[in-house]
Amino acid sequence: MRTLWIVAVLLLGVEGSLVQFETLIMKIAGRSGLLWYSAYGCYCGWGGHGLPQDATDRCCFVHDCCYGKATDCNPKTVSYTYSEENGEIVCGGDNPCGTQICECDKAAAICFRDNIPSYSNKYWLFLPKNCRGDPEPC
């Protein structure tokens, strides 16, 4: 519970992508990113190391890689534009960085939705000391 409060307080001052990422997760996966994915496995949340623990954690690993490939921008703070067309999220706008980040967030939200069956409570609040091994490169 303490971790949830810390994350909530941190997000109060955050603008841009992290808040938008939460919104996309809710729209696409039907779950709160903050409640379900902010402290899950080895990669969901701040940082990450070791091997992803399951398919859900792998979504976060791939998302981290996607953010790492974003050029000339700060993925956690840049705002982006998207629309909904025929039930699909369409990233767009005049900001190439924002579009890149939107695509990363959209892909992660779809991955979360598609891997809901893999979600395991044993990886919620998973201790970093349990994250072992060398992950494959991005």
From Swiss-Prot:
Instruction: Report the locations given in the UniProt record.
Output: Secreted
Q: Which cofactor does it need?
A: Ca(2+)
Listed as disulfide-bonded, the cysteine pairs are 42-131, 44-60, 59-111, 65-138, 66-104, 73-97, 91-102
Q: Which UniProt keywords apply?
A: Calcium, Disulfide bond, Hemostasis impairing toxin, Hydrolase, Lipid degradation, Lipid metabolism, Metal-binding, Platelet aggregation inhibiting toxin, Secreted, Signal, Toxin
- Reactions catalysed, as given in the entry: a 1,2-diacyl-sn-glycero-3-phosphocholine + H2O = a 1-acyl-sn-glycero-3-phosphocholine + a fatty acid + H(+)
- Keyword match Flavoprotein: no
GO molecular function, a single term: calcium ion binding
What SUPFAM superfamilies does the record point to?
A: Phospholipase A2, PLA2
| Family stated for the protein in its record | Belongs to the phospholipase A2 family. Group II subfamily. D49 sub-subfamily.
Q: Which PANTHER family match?
A: PHOSPHOLIPASE A2 FAMILY MEMBER (PTHR11716), PHOSPHOLIPASE A2, MEMBRANE ASSOCIATED (PTHR11716:SF9)
What is the name listed in the Swiss-Prot or TrEMBL entry for this protein?
Answer: Acidic phospholipase A2 Cvv-E6a
